[in-house]
């Protein structure tokens, strides 16, 4: 393998004297380089859209969204998956993140794990992957064996496969139905893909999960109406969402929120339709969980 041919491994000509810059100059240069990231992501929007459409269709068929990667790429997938539970009220199984070497690799590198094609396959076998699932392989270099092994197994099962790389003509692109290649250029610190590459991957993952959740009714207007109030902050947010969605008083929001068994989405439908809990629940079920359809 010739890493020198990968853009993510080449030296950034603008930062050759990085160790001689003042802190101010260094931060300004980092900021300038970071501004390239959203522009690079914008060029891949058509591919990201294709991925979202497939994820939504698979969710509606009972499928799951599974991210897999090694190192920073794997950690970002685990992070995005974990946030879906409190934000969108998903089950932990619906969106999952796999990292080469297992969860211990979130904090300590597991030597050799990313180089195992078999490990990538086995991690998906252990999840009992089906044709309704979507597997998103994330690798800044675009050549991680662990990810390639997972994508190949997913293809065998008939699952939808998506790849996210930060190099053009990435190897993993040949193993995915929907390849996404975000070319952010050389890192300011040569080969440190936790920087621009990691930022680019996070932006794409944000899009995949958020847009997909909108597509299955987890959002009303721009409000996260399936939020699960698992702590004090989220309880207060839930009440505020009801007020924002319905223009009702704080007192009404609290009362209906409790009547709806702390189900924000149900409470909103109850207020906007003036229905009982049972009636609103039926209306929401008929609308497949979409608040806008339930109240119109």
Swiss-Prot record:
Query: Active-site residues?
Result: 83, 114
One example GO MF annotation: carbon-oxygen lyase activity
Q: What class of enzyme is it?
A: lyase
> In the Enzyme Commission scheme, what number(s) does this protein have?
4.2.1.126
Lyase: present as a keyword of the record?
Answer: yes
Q: Report the domain of life of the source organism.
A: Bacteria
Q: Name one GO biological process term.
A: N-acetylmuramic acid catabolic process
Give the record's pathway: Amino-sugar metabolism; N-acetylmuramate degradation
* Cross-referenced Pfam families: GKRP_SIS_N (PF22645)
CDD domains named among the record's database cross-references: SIS_Etherase
Q: Which reaction does it catalyse?
A: N-acetyl-D-muramate 6-phosphate + H2O = N-acetyl-D-glucosamine 6-phosphate + (R)-lactate
Record-annotated SIS domain positions? 55-218
Q: Which UniProt keywords apply?
A: Carbohydrate metabolism, Lyase
**Is Cell membrane one of the keywords?**
no
What function does the entry list?
Specifically catalyzes the cleavage of the D-lactyl ether substituent of MurNAc 6-phosphate, producing GlcNAc 6-phosphate and D-lactate.
Q: How does it assemble?
A: Homodimer.
Query: What more does the record tell us?
Result: A lyase-type mechanism (elimination/hydration) is suggested for the cleavage of the lactyl ether bond of MurNAc 6-phosphate, with the formation of an alpha,beta-unsaturated aldehyde intermediate with (E)-stereochemistry, followed by the syn addition of water to give product.
HAMAP family membership: MurQ
Family listed? Belongs to the GCKR-like family. MurNAc-6-P etherase subfamily.
Quote the protein name from its UniProt record.
Answer: N-acetylmuramic acid 6-phosphate etherase 2
Identify the gene encoding this protein.
murQ2
């Amino acid at each position: 393998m010739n890493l020198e041919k990968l853009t993510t491994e080449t030296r950034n000509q603008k930062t050759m004297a990085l160790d001689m810059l003042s802190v101010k100059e260094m931060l300004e240069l980092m900021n300038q380089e970071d501004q390239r990231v959203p522009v690079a992501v914008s060029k891949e929007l058509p591919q990201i859209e294709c991925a979202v459409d497939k994820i939504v269709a698979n969710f509606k068929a009972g499928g799951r969204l599974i991210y897999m990667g090694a190192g920073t790429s794997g950690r970002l997938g685990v992070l995005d998956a974990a946030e879906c539970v409190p934000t969108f009220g998903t089950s932990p199984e619906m969106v999952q993140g796999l990292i080469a070497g297992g969860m211990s690799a979130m904090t300590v590198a597991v030597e050799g794990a990313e180089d195992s094609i078999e490990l990538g396959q086995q991690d998906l076998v252990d999840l009992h992957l089906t044709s309704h699932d979507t597997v998103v392989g994330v690798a800044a270099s675009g050549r991680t064996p662990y990810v390639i092994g997972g994508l190949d197994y997913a293809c065998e099962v008939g699952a939808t496969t998506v790849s996210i790389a930060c190099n053009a003509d990435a190897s993993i692109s040949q193993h995915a139905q929907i390849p996404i290649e975000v070319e952010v250029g050389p890192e300011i610190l040569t080969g440190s893909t936790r920087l621009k590459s990691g930022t680019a991957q996070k932006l794409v993952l944000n899009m995949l999960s958020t847009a997909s959740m909108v597509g299955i009714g987890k959002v009303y207007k721009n409000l996260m109406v399936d939020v699960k109030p698992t702590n004090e902050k989220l309880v207060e947010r839930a009440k505020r969402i009801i007020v924002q969605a319905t223009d009702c008083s704080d007192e009404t929001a609290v009362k209906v929120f409790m009547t709806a068994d702390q189900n924000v989405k149900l409470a909103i439908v109850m207020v906007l339709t003036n229905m009982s809990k049972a009636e609103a629940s039926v209306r929401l079920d008929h609308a497949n969980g979409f608040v806008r359809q339930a109240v119109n």
